[in-house]
């Protein structure tokens, strides 16, 4: 990747920052209730091959909106203003994001305080760490 050396962010050259990133194993949870940036963030995570996604498919909702208040201040609308285009020219909007490991949380387990997505993610990450340490 190209590095632009004359960019300074908060007193650091932009190219200095990637060497300070987290580079240990990681995993990300996603669920069917994710919306907007909660669709964009796991998409980038998967696209950059940072780690696995665990949970349920995320509907394609990655579009930025401008929040507009009408004359009646109780009426507020999000007007889509920015679409996020992929390298192939398609948009993230209406593009469902599938997890690497599909796990649903059922109402029966949630009311007991159990999170099967979190448990699956932790188990998978521990397996990855264990296999790296062999």
Language model features: what each stretch is:
Residues 1, 5-134:
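C-terminal "post-core" interaction segments
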């Amino acid at each position: 990747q190209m590095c632009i050396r004359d960019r300074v962010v908060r007193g650091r050259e932009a190219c200095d920052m990637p060497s300070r990133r987290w580079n240990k194993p990681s995993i990300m949870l996603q669920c069917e209730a994710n919306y907007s940036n909660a669709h964009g963030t796991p998409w980038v995570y998967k696209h950059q091959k940072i780690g696995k996604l665990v949970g349920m498919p995320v509907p394609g909702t990655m579009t930025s909106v401008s929040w507009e208040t009408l004359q009646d201040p109780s009426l507020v609308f999000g007007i889509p203003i920015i679409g996020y285009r992929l390298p192939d020219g398609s948009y993230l909007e209406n593009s469902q994001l599938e997890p690497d490991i599909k796990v649903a949380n059922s109402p029966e387990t949630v009311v007991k305080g159990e999170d099967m997505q979190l448990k699956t993610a932790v188990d998978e990450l521990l397996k990855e760490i264990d296999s790296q340490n062999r």
